[in-house]
Amino acid sequence: MIEKSMPAQNTHAADADLIGPDKSLLIVDDDTAFLRRLARAMEARGFAVEIAESVAEGIAKAKTRPPKHAVIDLRLSDGSGLDVIEAIRGRRDDTRMIVLTGYGNIATAVNAVKLGALDYLAKPADADDILAALIQRPGERVEPPENPMSADRVRWEHIQRVYEMCERNVSETARRLNMHRRTLQRILAKRAPK
């Protein structure tokens, strides 16, 4: 167990021991400042970091050298991080992947987990949260959130889940939710509630 009084470099050395022998980490995010900051923080914790700023670059790096660990933003400027997850999983089935999302869209995050991601974290996640998620052992319990979702947020997430299940078909989603199509379009156009 790491004591809080340990110096930072000893803590990071202990982190490196928890990572395992293959320390490769691919971080895919189109927010350059966040990407570089996270890459430095994860290198300090013992990872051998490679970065990609797009889906295309992430897939290319995954094909060239499939990583043991990956942190992937869900929404990238040229597409979905789900494509990077599929590319990694197609090359290496033991990769520990975490999905980052600035939108907190549970339906899409569930799809990411089904494709092989371990977990998803809301942005901006800090390096310690990401490290904890990457090294979490199977069966370990994660602390529940201190402030659960509001009723409006739960409704939004349900609508998003059905929307994803209907392959983003507004008319079909509206029919399944017993809602007028224009009402659904207005809801989807708004930002997610807190």
Swiss-Prot record:
Pfam families named among the record's database cross-references: Response_reg (PF00072)
GO biological process: phosphorelay signal transduction system
Source species, domain of life: Bacteria
PTM notes: Phosphorylated by ActS.
GO molecular function terms listed in the Swiss-Prot or TrEMBL record: DNA binding
PTM-bearing positions, type 4-aspartylphosphate: D73
PANTHER family: PROTEIN PILG, STRESS RESPONSE REGULATOR PROTEIN 1
The name this protein goes by in its record: Acid tolerance regulatory protein ActR
